Amino acid sequence: MKLYANNKCLDLSVPQIMGILNFTPDSFSDSGQFFSLDKALFQVEKMLEEGATIIDIGGESTRPNADEVSEQEELHRVVPVVEAVRNRFDCWISVDSSKAVVMREAANVGMDLINDIRALQEPNALETAVKLALPVCIMHMQGQPRTMQANPYYENVVQDVLAFLQKRTNECLSAGIKKENLIWDMGFGFGKSVQHNYQLLQNLNEFCQIGYPVLAGLSRKSMIGAVLDKPVDQRIIGSAAGALIAVQKGAKILRVHDVAATSDMLKVWQATANA
């Protein structure tokens, strides 16, 4: 299983680490501490040295109750960072956006992967993704970030999320997205209760069996905090445990804040798998 973009290849026969760079003043985890270009580049270098192969750049906070960001503001935040990272590093660059214009402009300066929490459902997003012909991660979310955690309900969360991803995948394929360019994300924490999240994690292998690489993003989220009863900055070990379970069940990309801890975990897991 491999991804290709811009003359680069990402080998998914081993799990890959996607390091999170929130270029926003209001992210739930890092509270804007990398909200300057110099700090952002320093953080990117650190994450790459620690073992990340993908850097995921986001200009809109998608935490619960987050305010939406205008197209112009998101462009202003994201495009210069993508360009600066591309000029300096040879890593994979993912952009966490649902806006067609952001996808297009980011691709012009070196983006390799579209990471869309709204699964290409915003205006012109699907058509833009088809034209760009880059790998794209589609995610399940019930509602929108502002309201998604208001009593989420499912008949069966595993089957409901699976049905959405299969339906959306078929729509993407019909529109012209190549099968080998699709990645699935179950959307931990996006319109799900703590119980829903753990049911999805427990059954993550069902999603992997369909044949698309699965991205797991549960780093520092409330599903970890609820079990540990610890604030965001004290969820590193819990997040690594969740990531390990995801990998054991077949996840191929781990979207994380704490790259070093995740990389150490993967090395021990790999040594065991190879024994």
Curated annotation (Swiss-Prot):
Chain sites annotated for binding Mg(2+): N22
Residues reported in the UniProt entry to bind (7,8-dihydropterin-6-yl)methyl diphosphate: T62, D96, N115, D185, K221, R255, V256, H257
Co-factor requirement: Mg(2+)
Disulfide bond sites: none
Catalyzed chemical reaction(s): (7,8-dihydropterin-6-yl)methyl diphosphate + 4-aminobenzoate = 7,8-dihydropteroate + diphosphate
Metabolic or biological pathway: Cofactor biosynthesis; tetrahydrofolate biosynthesis; 7,8-dihydrofolate from 2-amino-4-hydroxy-6-hydroxymethyl-7,8-dihydropteridine diphosphate and 4-aminobenzoate: step 1/2
Keyword Transcription regulation attached: no
Residue span(s) of domain Pterin-binding: 15-267
Protein task: Catalyzes the condensation of para-aminobenzoate (pABA) with 6-hydroxymethyl-7,8-dihydropterin diphosphate (DHPt-PP) to form 7,8-dihydropteroate (H2Pte), the immediate precursor of folate derivatives.
UniProt subunit comment: Homodimer.
Similarity comment: family membership: Belongs to the DHPS family.
Official protein name in the record: Dihydropteroate synthase
